[in-house]
From Swiss-Prot:
Residues 395-432 are annotated as: Disordered. This is ATP-dependent RNA helicase RhlB. GO terms for cellular component: cytosol. A motif (Q motif) lies at residues 9-37. Belongs to the DEAD box helicase family. RhlB subfamily. CDD domains: DEADc, SF2_C_DEAD. Its main location: cytoplasm. It comes from Shewanella denitrificans (strain OS217 / ATCC BAA-1090 / DSM 15013). Component of the RNA degradosome, which is a multiprotein complex involved in RNA processing and mRNA degradation. ATP binds at A53, Q54, T55, G56, T57, G58, K59, T60. Residues 423-432 have a biased composition (Basic residues).
């Protein structure tokens, strides 16, 4: 993590439980990020907060540290039963819930607190078996949590800490009725530590906070610009005919360490996967139709470096928190301005540099003026030499074909390879 992304506040200087400090030290957390430095002193006084912070700012560790510390320093309710978690963390997507649980397990190692996770798309009974053994901190999506509450599998009568993450996305996805349902089944707000985090503290988000929290203090870490200065943005104006060849040429030129390619439709994503796979890239496909187990496997492969490229729709990519994404390619400009910010925000995180490349094609170029107005600046235009685009592109792979997951860059088999390192190919020349 870049030091410029951190504050001067040390975790060790905060009044945290010794076991929390030990877990932070073991995982390399010494200095707080700005949102952690602002929110933890408030939360450690058992005061509620409504925090405004973008993804990639460290807000997840902020509320996890506060949650673990609160449970370790506050006695559990005397009448608590095995099916009653002490803390609940609600997330808008299963991918975000999985990431939160992964981070929570880093802190749970020395505390004796049990972490459980529930979300749709996975076996109801398998997740129930975990709950039946008892969990202290329950992480999940609202729909699956409600299922277990209604079935009497869990009770929220002993909740002592509540986290609502990405509240603005909860509104976007229509989950607010679910959230209010769950809040009404918890102890009074005055007997809980309540935390809400959102990229924007709109009036509807603030109303939710004040309805179900105890006079929360507003904590804001708002960037001066909607897009990070760490991200180099550029845009091309390709013809429909050139669009795919331009993407493949740029990806060969950039040779990104880890890239996400966004498109607006499932069909377009499948087409992109076919061409990228045919060209020898190690690529995963993430659309709404991909089964949950396969989604998890693809994300694990992408995170570990077994896949270099992820092709995704906006809906399928919501809630993803993957570090070290070097490049984002907007094959289609999104129809929603906020989606542009969310897309390119996958790179340039935690103080790292990132690159965003967008295509303003004949179909989606009309989306650009609204996007530029929303982000407050023009995206620099880059030009390409049509004659320099790749002309030896292999045939795309059919989507139903089972493709190998063990492919590597060196020695990968493809129509343009004869084995060994990738041979040199024509490249576009872009202005520096």
């Amino acid at each position: 993590m870049s030091e410029t992304h951190l504050s001067t506040q040390r975790f060790a200087d905060l009044p945290l439980h010794a076991e929390v400090i030990q877990a932070l030290n073991e995982n390399g957390f010494e200095f707080c990020t700005p949102i952690q430095a602002l929110s933890l002193p408030v939360l450690l006084k058992a005061k509620d907060i409504a925090g405004q912070a973008q993804t990639g700012t460290g807000k997840t560790m902020a509320f996890l540290v506060a949650t673990f510390n609160h449970l370790l320093t506050t006695p559990a309710p005397q009448a608590r039963e095995l099916n009653q978690p002490r803390a609940i963390i609600m997330a808008p997507t299963r991918e975000l819930a999985i990431q939160i649980a992964k981070d929570a397990n880093l802190l749970a190692k020395h505390t004796g607190l049990k972490v459980g996770i529930v979300y749709g798309g996975e076996s109801y009974e398998v997740q129930r078996e975990v709950l039946d053994k008892g969990v202290d901190i329950l992480i999940g999506t609202t729909g699956r949590i409600i299922d277990y509450v209604r079935q009497g599998v869990i009770s929220l009568n002993s909740i002592q800490a509540v986290v609502l993450d990405e509240a603005d996305r909860m509104f976007d996805l229509g989950f607010i009725k679910d959230i209010r349902f769950l809040f009404r089944r918890m102890p009074d707000a005055s007997s809980r530590l309540n935390m809400l985090f959102s990229a924007t503290l709109s009036m509807k988000v603030q109303e939710l906070a004040y309805d179900h929290m105890n006079d929360p203090e507003k904590v804001e870490v708002t960037p001066e610009e909607k897009t990070s200065k760490n991200i180099k943005e550029e845009i091309f104006y390709p013809s429909t005919e050139d669009k795919m060849r331009l993407l493949l040429t740029l990806m060969e030129e950039d040779w990104p360490e880890k890239a996400i390619v966004f498109s607006n439709t499932k069909h377009s994503c499948e087409n992109l996967w076919s061409w990228l796979e045919g060209d020898g890239h190690r690529v995963g496909l993430l659309t709404g139709d991909v089964p949950q187990k396969k989604r998890i496997r693809i994300l694990e492969q992408f995170t570990s470096g077994d896949l270099d490229v992820l092709v995704a729709t906006d809906v399928a990519a919501r809630g993803l928190h993957i570090s070290d994404v070097s490049h984002v390619y907007n094959y289609d400009l999104p129809d929603d301005c906020e989606d542009y910010v969310h897309r390119i925000g996958r790179t340039g995180r935690a103080g790292n540099k990132g690159v965003s490349v967008s295509f303003a094609c004949e179909t989606y170029a009309l989306n650009l003026p609204a996007i530029e107005q929303y982000i407050g600046h023009s995206v620099p235009v880059s030009r390409y030499d049509r004659e320099a685009l790749l002309d030896d592109i292999p045939t795309p792979v059919k989507i139903h074909r089972k493709h190998p997951t063990s492919r590597t860059r060196d020695g990968a088999k493809g129509a343009h390879r004869s084995g060994g390192a990738r041979p040199p190919r024509h490249r576009t020349r872009r202005p520096s």
